[in-house]
Amino acid sequence: MDDKRFWDRYSKNYSALMRRSERMYLQIHKAIRPFLKRDMDVLELACGTGQLSVPLSPYVRTWEATDFSPEMVTQAKKQLHTSRLHFSVQDATKLPYGPESFDAVVISNALHIMPQPEKALSEAWRVLKPGGFLFAPTFVWGNGRWAGFRLWVMGLSGFHVYHRWTAGKLMAYLSERKYAILHHQLLGSKYAPL
């Protein structure tokens, strides 16, 4: 099964599954919120069903939430949202937006499951205004004895993890792609450290 079919298949249950990590998402909201300003235009890549888009979009001028799964976007559009929020199906590695279009790019819980995250990061860099922010909460490889087993079980359903970064290796990976790390924080979740 390819990745898009996997996410389309799980889109109806994704929000319920992510509720198990509600505390983690609240921590992500709390970390991102102070950087958001009313005059900002934000692009979100891999928005899923709107776990970040819906609660954070009221704090900015516009929030363009995208995902490559049409079914995820369909589910996201069912969420309560504001006129500032727009959902669309987009490929994070081939964005239709012009250079320097956004004040911030959010790519949450997705870099590790992208076959070529460097392409998405390059596109994010291209569409970011000078001095813009990238918010990239990402599951990292932990030391827990159950981490490998969980991934194996998830893999049986078609879920692919292409990159198993530690927190340090993820920061190095981002730095190698021009991003300056202003803040990092390790959060816990039901699945893996973030």
For every predicted segment, state its role.
Residues 118-130:
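A short glycine-rich, Lys/Arg-flanked "PGG" loop and its adjoining helix->strand segment in the class I
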